[in-house]
């Protein structure tokens, strides 16, 4: 896990996957690389990006730039999420369940990296459907973006938190 110091904000970044593609030309194969990168501040902000280039470091750099531009704020309560939610993107679905203190981060692969950079420490997850890293990253972020704090839900309904 790397920390990048940009001005006042320190970002955590993770490379999820690097893919190599080949274009066959008369003189041989021409390779290009793509990299899926997630970036977060460890305190409720997370973003994902896909960078493509002829070299791996350049693809990672482009992915990090795109991830920083797509950062969104998510609701975190005491190191976990307020309630259970399913994030969907394409054929990938991710079930996210809140967990009590001390449970840890029960997640694998792409989902784990997204949750780590977002700053979530106690959560249970299950990948349903596709296990494609592109879809899992986007489904996880989509599920986290759908979360709202109980206070905000109560205010939108015009009720107190205890009534909900």
Swiss-Prot record:
Any single Gene Ontology cellular-component annotation? small ribosomal subunit
Keywords carried by this UniProt record: Ribonucleoprotein, Ribosomal protein, RNA-binding, rRNA-binding
Any one GO BP annotation for this protein: translation
One GO MF annotation is: structural constituent of ribosome
**Gene3D superfamilies in alphabetical order:** 3.30.160.20, 3.30.230.10
Q: Which residues form the S5 DRBM domain?
A: 11-74
Q: Which Pfam families match?
A: Ribosomal_S5, Ribosomal_S5_C
> What task does this protein carry out?
With S4 and S12 plays an important role in translational accuracy.
Comment on protein domains = The N-terminal domain interacts with the head of the 30S subunit; the C-terminal domain interacts with the body and contacts protein S4. The interaction surface between S4 and S5 is involved in control of translational fidelity.
Query: HAMAP family given for it?
Result: Ribosomal_uS5_B (MF_01307_B)
The text of the family note is: Belongs to the universal ribosomal protein uS5 family.
What does the subunit comment say?
A: Part of the 30S ribosomal subunit. Contacts proteins S4 and S8.
Descriptive protein name: Small ribosomal subunit protein uS5
